Amino acid sequence: MTINFESQVVLVTGGTRGLGREFSLCLGASGATVAVNSTTSDDAGVIDTITGSGGQAAHFAALVERPDSLIEAVVERFGRLDAIIHNAGFVRDKTLRKMTDEQWQEVIDVHLSAAFKLTREAWPHFEAAGGGRIVFISSASGLYGNFGQSNYAAAKMGMYGLARSISMEGGRSNITCNCVAPVGATTMNSGHWSDRDKEIRKAEYVAPLVAYLAHSSCEESGSFFETSAGSYKKLRWERTEGLNLFPADSPVTIDTIAENWQTITNFELTEHPQSMADSLQRMYVRFDD
């Protein structure tokens, strides 16, 4: 199997530096027409690198927080849009107690709100193209939390709820949406890493997974992946079988919860709900007997 992006136009936000640069280069080398976005007019040599190897690419300077003109410019230039990789973003790290409203909102806007707005603006163009692929670049901070990053963690985990909803709404139109939490060595994050760590965590190693999720042949949707150092893993929800009572027969009190805490939190027996309906059905099934 050879994955080729010929005739597919892919927009990469934040596509000139760090991980975004690797996404752009990987796509360009695989035949995609790459719409490379950044906030400034400096494309950091990405366009020349892609076109110098025979690929097609153009740079679009725009703020992703206001994406209507960006999407319009890409479609006007290339005639279509097939996929978006939303990678643009920044951090404003502070402990929650010291974080300002502005520091909170800036991070929410560039990561989560922009993901929503980009998707909304691109939707009719995806439908016109017969489908679309959306990849949100999330973070392990969203999955696990991180000290001093309550804004960033909330935005990055919010992307997953958004992706799940998009995957449901987009199913009939062949529009998919997934999240990836990558870790790769970039100038921004690797200053304190050893040379060995930088070598095994090269940013280019995470790009193939992201690119595949953006390809028209990939039907995966509503999923969350982690990748670093050549590892590629899909996540799923897991919960305990927990405590399942019949409150109508025996009232449940705060003491009931406290006395059964080990049962509620014991992961020896688990469930893996796939949707809200599945989650609730597993809670209600015992009443069907």
Model-predicted segments: where are they?
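Residue(s) in the substrate-gating loop at a strand-loop-helix junction
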Residues: 139
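C-terminal helical subdomain
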Residues: 197-288
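Conserved glycine-rich cofactor-binding loop
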Residues: 16-17
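Active-site helix of classical SDR
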Residues: 119, 155, 163
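Conserved amphipathic alpha-helix within the SDR
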Residues: 51, 58-61, 65-79, 127
